[in-house]
Amino acid sequence: MFSIGFIIIAVIIVVALLILFSFVPVGLWISALAAGVHVGIGTLVGMRLRRVSPRKVIAPLIKAHKAGLNLTTNQLESHYLAGGNVDRVVDANIAAQRADIDLPFERGAAIDLAGRDVLEAVQMSVNPKVIETPFIAGVAMNGIEVKAKARITVRANIARLVGGAGEETIIARVGEGIVSTIGSSEHHTEVLENPDNISKTVLSKGLDSGTAFEILSIDIADVDISKNIGADLQTEQALADKNIAQAKAEERRAMAVASEQEMKARVQEMRAKVVEAESEVPLAMAEALRSGNIGVKDYYNLKNIEADTGMRNAINKRTDQNDDESPQQ
């Protein structure tokens, strides 16, 4: 009986220990104690009940304690519950402390929750980043297109990481400054001879205002001559003027052809009227003879006049033809 009761008690104790070890991360608790971080078992159980992974909080807490940061489990747990990356924020605070950068945990947590990489921002504050722009084209006053590529050295401004503009804004502003500087040059050779004028002009405009970066320098990496935009525009304008002139000439030619056809139609109309009038002459003559208005002698005189007129016209036509043929011979 004694042995059976002892076995039952031992089984109960083992089951209780298994349940305890599965619910309470005893190994993590021992690691915290060994690192000098005092975390109660009740705190770990409370994290389990709040669906917080104790390792996600205690491991960064141990790291912060070893680095000399004064952080509490409540700070780390609240950031974890807000959806932040606790380990990255703690790493950023450690890096900021080593670099003598003022970065409270609350600011780092806010930067992390805003979607920024706070650790990368701290690293960029220590080691500035170089942003290379694509080729940016501008046209000088003499019409020559110049393309320039710039390298922008920036340092993260931790105070403006939340709400500050990103790299795209920096590139766009620098590109605008390059285009403006090239466009204000009277000759493209000025840009080739003094490319540093571009960087000086652009840097003096304070392009980093409202951004999450501080511009340290702008260096022109490459300058290329593209094409003569002014000549191309003049060529296109001349071609457009030529097309307009051709269109107007074609319009005038079409109007002239239409007018010619109209005149031909009128000539044919007049000829038809003449033929119609000539067809009425015999009838009028017959009526005049019948009524006695003219005599037979008058009629023959009229016929003689018509014959004489026809003969003269024939002679004139033949003379004109001979005059036209004589220069050709």
Curated annotation (Swiss-Prot):
Which organism is this entry from?
A: Staphylococcus epidermidis (strain ATCC 35984 / DSM 28319 / BCRC 17069 / CCUG 31568 / BM 3577 / RP62A)
This chain's protein is named Flotillin-like protein FloA
> What function does the entry list?
Found in functional membrane microdomains (FMM) that may be equivalent to eukaryotic membrane rafts. FMMs are highly dynamic and increase in number as cells age. Flotillins are thought to be important factors in membrane fluidity.
- Report the transmembrane regions from the record: 4-24, 26-46
Q: How the protein assembles, per its UniProt entry? A: Homooligomerizes.
Q: In which compartments does the protein localize?
A: Cell membrane; Membrane raft
The record's similarity note reads: Belongs to the flotillin-like FloA family.
Alphabetical keyword list? Cell membrane, Membrane, Transmembrane, Transmembrane helix
Subcellular location, principal = membrane
One Gene Ontology CC term in the entry: plasma membrane
Q: Has the keyword Transmembrane helix been applied to this entry?
A: yes
Q: How does it sit in the membrane?
A: Multi-pass membrane protein
Q: Which domain of life is it from?
A: Bacteria
